[in-house]
Structure formats: C-alpha cells, structure tokens
Amino acid sequence: MQFQLPTPHMTFDIALDDGAKIRMRRHGRADGVRLLLSHGNGFAADAYFPYWQHLLPQFDVLVFDFRNHGQNTPAVPSHHTYEQLVRDLERVTQEVTARLGKKPTAGIFHSMSGRTAMKHAIEVGWRWDALVLFDPPNMPPPGHPIYDVMAAFEKRLTAWAKARRRRFNTVEELAEDYRQSRAAARWVPGAHDLMARSVLRRSPDGDGYELVCDPENEATIYAQAMALNLWPAASAFGGPVKLIGCDPHMKGSTTGPANQALGAEGGYDYSFVADTGHLLQIEKPEECAKLTVEFLARCGLA
C-alpha cells in the first residue's frame, strides 16, 4: 500500500522574522472549522496523512511543517530553538488569519509542535478556540517520580540524533530503515514509505537524498527539552485543551506515563490510545481522529 496525498486547494508561503519561510497547504472543506496541524521533531506533517485524511470531509485543514522540516527549505542559520519555533507559530497564526480571514480555529499538534503550542499559548497568547495535543514529551520538574526516566529518555534521543545517518541513495533506503525499526513496527501499512518521502529532499549536490531536518537540529530540540520548564496546568491556557497520550502501560513507554501524570496533576481532559507508542497518529489513525472530533464537538467546533 502507498499513500497518495491529495493536491492542496491552496498553497502559500509565510515569511518568518529571520527570512525563513513556511509552506502552508490547505486541504478539506474551505467552509469548515479551521484546523492547523503540524508534526514532531525530525518528522513532517505530510507523514501524518493516515490521521488527518479522516478530518478532510468536515474541516478546513491547514497542514504545515515547522522550520527546517518537511516541505520547507532549511534555514541558514537554522535558528532551531523552541524560542524561535514559538515566534514562528505566532507568525503562522497571524498570517493565516490575515490571508484567509478570522473564523473558529483549533490547533492539532504532536510532540515537538505540541510543546511549541503549549509554550506559545502560555507565554505569547491564546490564539485558538481549542487545542489538541498528541503526546507532548514534557519534562516534569526535578524531584518528580518520573523526572529521571524522562531525563534519560531525552539524553538517549539526543545522542541517537547526533549519530543519525544524514544521506541516502534512494528514498527506499530510509523507508526500509523505518520498516526495520522497532519504534515504527506498529505504523500502519504504507506509513514507512510516506514518512521517508516526507522527511527527505534531493541533496543540493545532486547525489541522492538527505534529511530536511539535519541531525544536529534534531538533537538540539531533544536537548532543549531539559530546560523548557513546561509542566503547566490546564487552567494556564486561555481555552479548552485535549491531551492525548500514547499507551502508558506499554513496556518501555516514557512519554505515555509522563502524559498520564501531566493529565492527572494538571487537570486536563486526558485520554490515551491503547497499544500505541509515541507516533500514535500513525499507529492508530482512526482512533486518534475519533478522539479529536469528539473533543472538537464538545467545544462546539464539530
């Protein structure tokens, strides 16, 4: 099976404050509630199509990659920090409203983009009618029962990203790496090829392919998690937030228990998807879409 993404109804670029650009793609129903949707560190929004395809019949879906990811040309210098990602998200929300008009809007964000959306909403301002956060890998404060586990997890990811292979002769090489990865074993059929197509670009020197998000940038984001101080209560936001985690009972899960703890301690509307890991939207896309729409309906948005 191979996923074929639909042609967007509209594409446009958003210029960021340092000259970098983000490519926006508009899918779904133009008359529907607006959804802004993005991805996790080192991934790309197109690769989440197994999930967001289920939202297209009802919603106006704007899909985008954060800087140095996906369809965007890598920035030089990269300015690949959470502080910059927060500024970028503010620019995205402003420009989308300026170009397409104001209407009910929800944000749907996974992992890195989820943390960015949380930080943006608390430190910059609430720009949404609702937020849906998939498994943001937040660090609890020092002394918390799961702090050491999460700290070790982020350090392992940082080391892994620094050593990650950057270049590939073909897209299929990376797709096969994903198929052989234990972490990607539960992805739906076709997702491994889609992910490889989404995170690679042709090498500027014409020799094969390379990761759009280079390993140094990916490692930087993992390392910055240690100092974000992001463990907010749901009441810290200016509107309704849904927290959806991976299965906290899965063997070896770290982000699952972390989100379960955040949900309980922070008073969130929290759910988890059984038998999933961190890429839950690609492992059980229909279940994730169902939870999304049910929450949006409770908010009067579906």
Please annotate each region the language model reported:
Residues 17, 66-108, 290:
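Active-site loop/oxyanion-hole signature of alpha/beta-hydrolase fold enzymes
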Residues 23-74:
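Conserved HGGG/HGGXW glycine-rich cap/lid loop of the alpha/beta-hydrolase fold
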Residues 276-285:
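Catalytic histidine-centered segment of alpha/beta-hydrolase-like enzymes
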Residues 163-223:
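Conserved alpha/beta-hydrolase catalytic His-Asp/Glu region
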Residues 201-263:
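Conserved serine/cysteine hydrolase catalytic core
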